[in-house]
Amino acid sequence: MMPDITFGPKGWMPERLGDLSGKTFLITGANAGAGFQAARMLLKKNAKVVMLNRSVEKSQAAVADLKSEFGSEAEVSFIRMDLASLANVREAADQVLNSVTRIDALICNAAIAQVPTRKLTEDGFESQLGTNHYGHFLLCGLLFERIEASKGRIVVVASLGYNMGLKTIKFDDMNWEEGYGPNTAYSQSKLAQMMFAYELQDLLAVAGRTEVEVYVCHPGSSATSLISTSGSRTMRFIWWLMTKTPMVQTAEQGSYPEVMCATEETLTDQRALYGPTGRLEAVGPVGKGTLHPHAYDKTVMTRLWEVTEQETGFKWKI
């Protein structure tokens, strides 16, 4: 496949951003890494940013950093939310709906990765599936009407990991009671997130509710804190070594795809995967990359949606 050159040889760049005054962006997992850099980029253009983060201390520090960079009047705040707790996601969504009048984009950026040994969330889900997929599924559902009223977007930050592992959903053992591996479980969780996005696109199209656009992107290999926070010591060391090579880009570059998907008005193709288009699609100019068909296998997507509604106890009204 030829690299996408929609945005020229350098790909999408933040210079394309216009003034974002009056727009509100919600970002999950925005106190570090690509999520934090996305918040910076949006604030720089006068947007309002609400972070949805698990750690209060790290969020307070991130808000303080951003206000010291952009001034005390910068519109940045946080709401505490732990994606690993469905009850907590519901509380956070209530807070959002009580305090945020419009949502121009909800960027589902938070994730945990490479959890060394199998752990369960308080709801009994394998931790990566519970956090990355179920938590975001519920959050998007609870905020959907507000996003739709704002003619906003949902941006799912996926990972090239979807193309590793089983390349399908292990319906007979989604919580990995047998055969748990940090990478295979992570890959399934990211594939599930992509399938959620692509199935949502289909459901909205059938219902004629096309005000909300749903985009899927990935950061490529960016030097974010993902592996360093939840991976094993060996994985963290390997990643640290990799960050010293040209196969890894900065966290700021890693945020380009999600900011592009949240703001770029010329994007039209929603059944796509946006991200770096250079070597191995891990680095390089940002545009439309390769999307492998197992990510939108209709039978699997439809079944996953039904299972996810059952598991989360939340039924989308589309």
Each language-model region and where it sits:
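Ankyrin-repeat alpha-helix packing hotspot
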Residues: 133-134
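A short, exposed helix-loop element centered on a Lys and neighboring polar residues
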Residues: 140-141, 198
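Extended catalytic-interface subdomain
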Residues: 155-158
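NAD(P)H-dependent oxidoreductase Rossmann-fold/reductase module
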Residues: 1-106, 111-113, 118, 160-170, ...
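A short helix->loop->beta-strand "cap" motif at the edges of active sites that frequently abuts
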Residues: 47, 150-152
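Helix-to-beta-strand junctions that scaffold the AdoMet/dcAdoMet cofactor pocket
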Residues: 147-150, 205
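Substrate-binding pocket helix/loop in short-chain dehydrogenase/reductase
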Residues: 117-118, 124-126
